Design a protein with these regions (language model features):
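Membrane-proximal alpha-helical signals and transmembrane carboxylates
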Residues: 2-398
């Protein structure tokens, strides 16, 4: 029997491996994807037009480079009868179909106030490539123009707004961050109400050298393909747009937004100013627990707005003995002033929601769960007919 030659077999395997590697190299670059196919949409703005819908997509396009500066951000606009039609127009302009799997931000322009927002957003709930996690917001003016803004901080409008609406910002109670999934659940509940951040742009014509350096640094990791000149922009996201049955119902101001977030979100890093005996105290709150509930009483509904926290004085509008500061004890009068301040904020919020007939606190949904008979009796009138009760408690950290 002929002896099996292992050396010859190894040589054959080696030759086959070299041939296969050469084939991959000369035909497919080892499976590397064409750089044009890696362009992704990171943010999208939607405006309503006379002809239908205008979608402005902010696209991150990788570019070959020797020094690592390899991403350019461009804005591409498409207009059609629906969002899907508008995205198809973007396909015609760019040569690739805009999949939204990496889209992190959706902005509705001011023109969307005149429509049911869920008719506008229908595509995003149907599309297989779209997650339900993109943050959604409404802006003043045009969403397309906002996305093309020249930024003072950050590479692009999408990146800057994403920071402002991050989970950390949400925990400060200053912004009402929500995503597609959250507004869908809220709108199609018994309360039929939802909300989202309202963005305002503010021009900064006299940018400091540091700000200009920040803007230039944005071109290292990414260069905006928007306008070259014009004023720098910064964004304010401290107001909230509210919706009833998918229709725009109004805007909550900064204090009402703050109160809404204290009741709806898990918050920390919270600061509340109050006045006691003519002196302004800024209270730092931790271990915050807030919520809105509803119960039946005497054949009617009572809305209960509850909040509790541990308090320390973060700042005082006068000089104080450092020894008293180190003790960390908050005077009883200051605690009561803080509670009164919070009750005032909650009352302002409840009054604004009642006036707009927008149950953003989900009182109807909660009453439906816990007292179905009373809900059926008050259906559509839970917010307007409910009495209001507060349970606000602050205690000193020291």
């Amino acid at each position: 029997m002929k002896k099996f030659d292992l050396k010859r077999l190894a040589a054959i395997i080696y030759a086959l491996a070299i041939t296969a590697m050469a084939f991959l190299f000369f035909t497919n670059d080892f499976g590397l994807v064409d750089i044009r196919k890696t362009a992704v949409i990171i943010g999208a703005g939607i405006d309503l037009t006379e002809g239908g819908v205008s979608v402005t997509a902010q696209v991150a396009v990788p570019q070959p480079s020797e020094n690592g500066e390899n991403t350019v951000y461009i804005e591409v606009e498409g207009e059609g009868a629906t969002v899907a039609d508008a995205l198809n127009v973007i396909n015609k302009k760019t040569g690739f179909f805009p999949k939204l799997v990496f889209c992190k931000l959706l902005i509705l322009g001011e023109s969307c106030r005149n429509a049911d927002i869920f008719e506008v957003l229908d595509y995003f709930y149907r599309d297989d490539y779209t997650q339900l996690t993109p943050v959604i917001a409404m802006c003043s003016g045009s969403a397309g123009e906002l996305l093309a803004s020249k930024m003072r901080f950050g590479n692009t409008a999408t990146v800057s707004i994403e920071r402002l609406l991050s989970d950390e910002a949400k925990k400060s109670a200053n912004v009402s961050t929500v995503n597609l999934k959250m507004i869908g659940i809220d709108n199609f509940s018994q309360s039929a109400a939802c909300y989202m951040p309202y963005i305002r742009a503010r021009a900064q014509s006299a940018a400091s050298p540091a700000a200009q350096s920040t803007g230039g640094g944005g071109q290292s990791g990414g260069q905006s393909g928007g306008e070259e000149g014009g004023d720098m922009q910064e964004f304010l996201c401290d107001r909230t747009a509210i919706f009833r049955g998918g229709r725009f119902a109004g805007i909550l101001d900064e204090e009402q937004t703050f109160a809404l977030n204290l009741l709806k979100n898990s918050v920390r890093h919270v600061f509340v100013p109050c006045t006691y005996e003519g002196t302004v105290y800024t209270l730092g709150l931790r271990n915050c627990r807030g919520g809105a509930g509803v119960r039946s009483s005497g054949g009617g509904a009572v809305a209960r707005l509850a909040f509790s926290a541990v308090v320390q004085v973060s700042d005082v509008g006068r000089a104080e003995d450092p020894r008293s500061v180190s003790e960390g004890v908050v005077p009883e009068g200051v605690l009561r002033a803080g509670e009164a301040r919070l009750r005032g904020l909650f009352f302002s919020l409840f009054s604004a929601l009642r006036e707009a007939d927008c149950d953003a606190l989900e009182l109807g949904t909660k009453l439906f769960r816990y007292d179905r008979a009373l809900y059926e009796e008050l259906e559509g009138r839970v917010l307007s007919s409910a009495q209001l009760a507060f349970e606000v408690s602050l205690r000193s950290a020291g």
